[in-house]
Design a protein with these regions (language model features):
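Extreme N-terminal starter segment of soluble prokaryotic enzymes
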Residues: 2-3
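Acetyl-CoA-dependent GNAT
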Residues: 7-88, 93-95, 112, 146-152
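Active-site acidic-Proline motif in GNAT/NAT acetyltransferases
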Residues: 93-95, 99, 127-128
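Conserved GNAT acetyl-CoA-binding A-motif
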Residues: 106, 114-124
Length: 152
């Protein structure tokens, strides 16, 4: 496996954005945060705030993950301050999951983050996403906050 991170072009970004809005909306519904009828519009607003200039939004680095010429996923790293980064998205496309692409991508993004001068990287993972939580813990990411809620 030879993982390479290539800056997204506009076509790849549009494909990612369509996927990401739906995925984020679905995850918010699963978590009990949003209702079905409002989820897509709320997710769209969030992405418009985070990426007002699309893939050209300053301090945001959106990459297509490739294994050779094959597209296997995407990762989005935002530079929050001069020293802190935040991964807003890591998605390995269906059919490519469970093959080590997530782990290798995280290792590659850490190399790039250091080149950008970052000293730390944060990320968010939904509590129900045990596969992602396990991966991040194995890579040395530590929980900093835990939000808990009870539905009545």
């Amino acid at each position: 496996m030879m993982v390479r991170l290539d800056q997204m072009n506009s076509e790849e970004f549009q494909k990612y954005l369509s996927f990401a809005i739906k995925y984020f909306a679905d995850e918010q519904i699963k978590s009990g945060n949003w209702k079905l009828e409002e989820a897509i519009s709320k997710a769209t607003v969030e992405y418009e705030k985070l990426l007002p200039e699309g893939q050209d939004t300053e301090n945001n680095h959106l990459f297509t993950i490739r294994d050779g010429s094959k597209e296997v996923g995407m990762i989005w790293l935002a530079q929050i301050t001069n020293e802190k980064g935040f991964i807003y998205g890591l998605n390995i496309w269906e059919g490519n999951q469970g093959k080590g692409y997530g782990k290798k991508t995280m290792q590659e993004i850490e190399v790039l983050a250091k080149k950008f001068g970052l000293k730390s990287i944060g990320l968010h993972v939904f509590a129900h996403n045990n596969i992602a939580r396990d991966l991040y813990e194995k890579l040395g990411y530590k929980e900093k906050n835990i939000k808990m809620e009870k539905t009545l």
